[in-house]
Amino acid sequence: MKLTIAIVLVTLTLFCRPASTEVCPSLLYVLGNLIAGTPSSFEATLEPFSPDEDMKEATSQLKTLVDTLSPKAKDSMLELMMKIIQSPECA
């Protein structure tokens, strides 16, 4: 649970940086695969960033948890992410 909260906070910070007018496409791709991709596609999206073994294990655990959510819950998460990105706070 702490890892999930940390990832959400970091993600929101990156999305809403005052100095940034764009969201990093790689981050969006990784988050999209976390929510809607297969475990292997999610792992593949992380490889360009050379995660160490602890990072791989942590993200694997997170993906396993996310995959227990219903399709409706996953869709709602993606919708919320888009609302956040498009909100005035992130403009």
Curated annotation (Swiss-Prot):
One of its GO terms (biological process) is signal transduction. InterPro entries: Secretoglobin, Secretoglobin_1C-like, Secretoglobin_sf, Uteroglobin. Residues 1-21 form the signal peptide. SUPFAM superfamilies: Uteroglobin-like (SSF48201). Pfam families: Uteroglobin. One of its GO terms (cellular component) is cytoplasm. It comes from the Eukaryota. It is found in: Secreted. Keywords: Disulfide bond, Phospholipase A2 inhibitor, Secreted, Signal. GO terms for molecular function: phospholipase A2 inhibitor activity. Belongs to the secretoglobin family. PANTHER family: SECRETOGLOBIN FAMILY 1 MEMBER, UTEROGLOBIN. Binds phosphatidylcholine, phosphatidylinositol, polychlorinated biphenyls (PCB) and weakly progesterone, potent inhibitor of phospholipase A2. Antiparallel homodimer; disulfide-linked. Interaction with LMBR1L is controversial. This is Uteroglobin. It comes from Bos taurus. The gene is SCGB1A1.
